[in-house]
Structure formats: C-alpha cells, structure tokens
C-alpha cells in the first residue's frame, strides 16, 4: 500500500526542503539545488544528511522558523509532526494488503511512499534500520531504510516469537497504524485522510 501520488509529492516537498536547508546550514556537502522526484539526491548523501536531521530536533525547529517560507501550511505541519517519530531497528514481519507490519517494542502498520515496501523487501522477516513518521492518519518512513551489512536469517523459534508478538498486539488492539499528527497534540486527529493506492515506481524518494 502506498500514499496517493498527491500525498507522496507533499511529503517529498517537505522532506527535500528540510534536507537541503540542513545541508546548507551544516555544510555536510557542497550546496545543491533542492531535489525533486525526477532529480533526487544520491542515497548515500541523503542518508548522511538525514542522520544529522534526526539527531537534532532543534534543526527542524530552526527550519520551520527560518527556512520554510516557501512551503505551505500542510508541508509545515508535516515537518512539525516529525517530533513524534519512532526510530531504530525494526523487523519487517510481513506485508499485508493495507500495510507492512514493522515490529519493535510495539507493532506498526506502515505504508510505502513511492514504492511498495513489499517490492523493496520481498523476503521477510527482515531487519531494517528505519525512521517511522506520521502522515496524517497513517504511518510512513522517511524513505531511507537501511538493512544490516550481513545476511541474517530467522529460525523457526524466532519466527514463532515474532508472530506471537504480532498476534498479541492485534488481540489487544495495540497494532499502531497512526502516530500523533499535529505537533502540539498527544492524540492526533488528521485534517483529512490520504487516499492510499497501490502502484509501482522508484525504490525510494531521494
């Protein structure tokens, strides 16, 4: 399951503006024009910048105060909501019709942005390093998922344990398919719902 094309474009406008501004502010790499879906950043550079972005919440706050004048209110709300992100190592357990299941301490239902997650990670379960962020009433990633440098396999016992965690979350209605959306909210209500659609495109926004 994916964001709609319009919602994917909204995310990309906000994300690329933030990456560009942080790079200019911190001189991580020589300055570059703001990326577009047609002319994305090289993934290795995007990952370097994103690590700085997520390490310092103050940078996002400065961006909203000083560097986002050309963004609309939806893009600004989106960037502000990223204080509610969930970062770290996850197991992608399975791909369902409506979302992919990410497991950490909790279970999350996550959508792709431009490319279905089942195309990016066809063999599951799999370990990934990811940042989960809210997008109105769904959860997406920042588009830059990293796998371990070594091949890891799951034995029968590990698979049973992961499936038990997922089943327990479902039984207790604790499968998380949303994160707080408004930056000042602890329980968010989306301004309107995105329109998910299934389609194929690039592996990740860059």
Where in this protein do the model-derived segments appear?
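Short, structured beta-strand/loop micro-motifs enriched in basic residues and often containing a Trp
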Residues: 105-114
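Short, charged beta-strand/loop "edge" motif centered at a coil->beta-strand transition
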Residues: 74-80
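Short nucleic-acid-contacting surface segments enriched for D/E, G, S/T with interspersed K/R
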Residues: 114-131
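Short aromatic-glycine-enriched beta-strand elements
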Residues: 98-102
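Mixed-charge (acidic/basic) macromolecular-recognition segments
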Residues: 128-129, 134-206
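A structured, charge-rich N-terminal accessory region that forms the first stable segment of a protein
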Residues: 1-73
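Structural detector for short beta-strands of small beta-barrel domains
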Residues: 80-97
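Residue-level recognition of conserved beta-strand positions in structured domain cores
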Residues: 104-105, 143
């Amino acid at each position: 399951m994916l964001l709609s094309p319009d919602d994917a474009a909204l995310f990309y406008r906000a994300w690329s503006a933030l990456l560009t501004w942080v790079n200019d502010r911190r001189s991580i790499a020589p300055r570059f024009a703001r990326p577009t879906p047609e002319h994305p950043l090289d993934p290795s550079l995007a990952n370097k910048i994103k690590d700085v972005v997520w390490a310092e919440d103050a940078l996002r706050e400065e961006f909203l105060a000083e560097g986002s004048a050309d963004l609309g209110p939806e893009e600004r709300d989106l960037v502000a909501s990223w204080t509610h992100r969930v970062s770290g190592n996850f197991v992608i357990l399975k791909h369902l019709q409506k979302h992919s299941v990410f497991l950490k301490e909790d279970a999350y239902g996550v959508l792709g942005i431009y490319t279905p997650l089942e195309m990016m990670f066809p063999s599951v379960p799999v370990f990934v390093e990811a940042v989960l962020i809210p997008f109105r009433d769904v959860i997406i990633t920042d588009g830059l998922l990293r796998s371990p440098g070594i091949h890891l396999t799951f034995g029968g016992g590990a698979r049973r344990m992961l499936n038990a965690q997922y089943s327990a979350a479902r039984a207790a209605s604790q499968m998380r398919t949303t994160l707080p959306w408004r930056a000042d909210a602890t329980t968010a209500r989306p301004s309107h719902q995105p329109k998910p659609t299934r389609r194929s495109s690039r592996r990740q926004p860059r």
